[in-house]
A protein has these predicted regions:
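Surface-exposed loop/turn motifs in large extracellular/passenger domains
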Residues: 1-52, 57-78, 84-106, 112-133, ...
């Protein structure tokens, strides 16, 4: 794999902190350094690791402008474009490009434990995800906003019966203007089109108080179980202005 800064020089202590504990791979400021985790690139084309891959990981700061490409190999756990545990911190403009390989668990473009996630993206062109889901923008807890994130899937497969594809996911915050683009335009029943054993969600709020607004799912081909442009799963919340565009493919339920 390669790890590099595309535009500015990272502190040596950050740029060289590549973890192999449990075979995790990625730069991290787990010592809570003051620097934001930004402008890293990971290109993974190895055989297999038991753990996860991330473009950046921080205990205390924003994470932005990081990119992860998975070309081949077997990753036992998760893939993150960037991940922050910092309270109120933002994951923004992080990207993942999947062109091959097998991933055991979920994929997150930008993951914030208790902040916000904006303008993150995942592009899946090939490969397999054995369990769980793909998220462009994800906030694990609290009412942080998740906006303007996008998942594009033109090939590959998500196999788990509980799998899902989420443009944006928040625990109880505003989930707005997120997008899922599934399949390839102009080829409604093409061989090799992507498949998802589970569900497509443009925007998803898991808890009461969440809002799912103006999210979009567009399906061109391939196969999925169900489609929801916007959903608030529990309690009291609003799902408004969400849209599904179905141009081809198969929705099995």
């Amino acid at each position: 794999f390669d790890c590099k800064d595309n535009s500015t020089s990272l502190p040596e202590s950050l740029s060289l902190q590549i973890f192999n504990s449990k075979n995790h791979i990625g730069p991290s400021d787990l010592a809570s350094m003051a620097d934001n985790a930004t402008n890293n690139e990971i290109i993974y084309a190895s055989e297999s690791i038991n753990g996860s891959v991330w473009g950046a990981r921080s205990n205390s700061d924003d994470v932005s402008l990081n990119n992860v490409t998975i070309q081949s190999g077997n990753i036992g756990e998760f893939v993150y474009g960037a991940y922050t545990d910092g309270s109120g911190k933002i994951a923004t403009q992080n990207t993942i490009n999947l062109t091959g390989g097998t991933i055991g668990y979920s994929v997150y473009g930008g993951y914030s434990k208790n902040g916000s996630a904006e303008n993150n993206s995942v592009l899946m062109q090939a490969g397999d995800i054995t369990n769980y889901s793909v998220y462009a923008g994800y906030v694990d807890s609290g009412n942080g906003s998740v906006q303007l994130n996008k998942v594009t899937i033109t090939g590959g497969n998500l196999h788990g019966t509980n799998s899902g594809v989420y443009g944006g996911y928040s625990s109880s915050g505003l989930v707005k203007d997120n997008t899922v683009e599934f399949g390839t335009a102009g080829t409604p029943n093409a061989a090799g089109a992507p498949t998802v054993a589970g569900v497509l969600f443009g925007g998803y709020a898991a808890e009461s108080g969440g809002q799912a607004t103006s999210n979009t799912v567009t399906m061109h081909n391939g196969q999925v179980k169900r489609i929801y442009a916007g959903q608030v799963q529990k309690g009291i919340g609003n799902a408004t202005g969400n849209k599904v565009y179905l141009h081809g493919g198969y929705v099995t339920e």
